[in-house]
Amino acid sequence: MSEAELDEFLAAERTCRVATSGPDGPHLTALWFLWHDRTLWLTSITRAKRWAQLKRDPQASVLVDAGHDYGELRGAELRGDVEFVGEAPRTGENVPELAEPEKLFARKYFGVDQMFHDGRHAWLRMRPHTVVSWDFRKLG
């Protein structure tokens, strides 16, 4: 995919799979995400296994894919280190760098302009160092 196609694809999709690594091996979970300004934003429960694993080792691989039949398959793998942004868990403190991602995430998933803070989730940011994408619709 071109950069523009990748941006459009990641903006439209809703669920990604996040791979982390821990003492007992790989761990794979599905999460909602936001792609904004070439940055992947994830919100995670702070008591989740993935949170503890990312605290120990911030490296992650994220997969977003779509399509059912072979000729429809497309997707992207993003690899990089995850950063923890804002308070954990998130309670709504003023964190300027979260203002735009929270607004866009709230619109995408809840149809509102303001993020609800439940005191269980917190933000993760990945600025991928590697992106591999594919679009099998272009093959034929």
Language-model regions, residue ranges each:
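Short, surface-exposed beta-strand-loop junctions and turns on beta-sheet-rich folds
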Residues: 48-50, 69, 140
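A short, aromatic/hydrophobic, helix- or strand-capping loop or linear motif
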Residues: 20-22, 64-67, 110-119
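Charged, gly/pro-rich active-site loop segments
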Residues: 1, 73-140
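Short beta-strand segments
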Residues: 13-46, 54, 62-65, 74-76
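Structured helix-beta-strand junction loops
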Residues: 12-13, 56-57, 129
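Extreme N-terminal tail/first-helix region
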Residues: 1-16, 72
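Short secondary-structure boundary/capping segments
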Residues: 7-8, 32, 52, 68, ...
